[in-house]
């Protein structure tokens, strides 16, 4: 039986989320699928050989410094407070610049199962050049045992990159994601929903980055240590 309103699940997964697909697995060119001058956002997609689901890239401007944007994305334990559909987000362990994060996604809709996954996130920031970013890949073997009532996400890889604009007063944000939500969601539903979900990711970032705790570099969210 197909799950109802599958785009709600995809939208939730696209919010995480943040490593690029290996070069050998990429297609040649990105194709622009959405552009909004008012939002200063453009969304691209490209095929990934061997996968029915396309890789996505969102590029947009944020009216906040790169470090503030990075602070938001690195607030892993706080995702449930500002990321839609996130029921639980828990740091499992930290080794230097690498963080293991377990997440539970619940669209709270009939006939749609709760999803979960563990990802390995690497901090790839270059503070000296005011460039910040993360890359992640699926790491379910490092997380909790799968519960029968949940659908385990087997592929979730992506990245965030924040580079300075206007002498560091603003940010050019680049978000890349390739994920398969699993279950019985058809590939056409994933493709349809993904293009509509990326703008929501940027809206969440823009809304949250205005909070004082993310803009003040002397105070950082609990749960991580900036490099």
Predicted regions and their residues:
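A general boundary/transition motif marking the beginning of the first structured unit of a protein
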Residues: 1-2, 193
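Bacterial N-terminal signal peptides that target proteins for export
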Residues: 2-13
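Bacterial N-terminal signal peptides
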Residues: 11-21
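Eukaryotic helix-grip
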Residues: 26-227
């Amino acid at each position: 039986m197909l799950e109802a309103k599958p785009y709600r699940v995809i939208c939730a997964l696209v919010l995480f989320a943040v490593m690029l697909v290996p070069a050998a697995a990429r297609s040649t060119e990105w194709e622009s699928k959405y552009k909004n001058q008012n939002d200063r956002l453009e969304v691209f997609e490209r095929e990934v050989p061997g996968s029915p689901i396309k890789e996505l890239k969102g590029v947009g401007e944020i009216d906040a410094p790169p470090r503030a944007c990075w602070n938001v994305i690195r607030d892993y334990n706080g995702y449930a407070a500002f990321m839609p559909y996130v029921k639980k987000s828990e740091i499992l362990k930290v080794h230097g610049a690498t963080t293991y994060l377990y997440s539970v996604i619940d669209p709270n809709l009939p006939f749609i199962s709760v999803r979960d996954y563990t990802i390995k996130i690497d901090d790839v920031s270059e503070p000296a050049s005011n460039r910040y970013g993360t890359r992640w890949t699926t790491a379910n073997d490092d997380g909790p045992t799968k519960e029968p009532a949940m659908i385990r996400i087997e592929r979730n890889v992506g990245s965030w990159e924040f580079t300075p604009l206007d002498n560091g007063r603003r940010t050019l944000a680049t978000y890349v994601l390739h994920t398969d939500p699993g279950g019985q969601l058809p590939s056409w539903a994933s493709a349809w929903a993904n293009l509509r979900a990326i703008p929501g990711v940027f809206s969440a970032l823009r809304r949250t980055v205005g909070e004082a705790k993310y803009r003040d570099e002397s105070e950082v969210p609990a749960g991580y240590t900036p490099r």
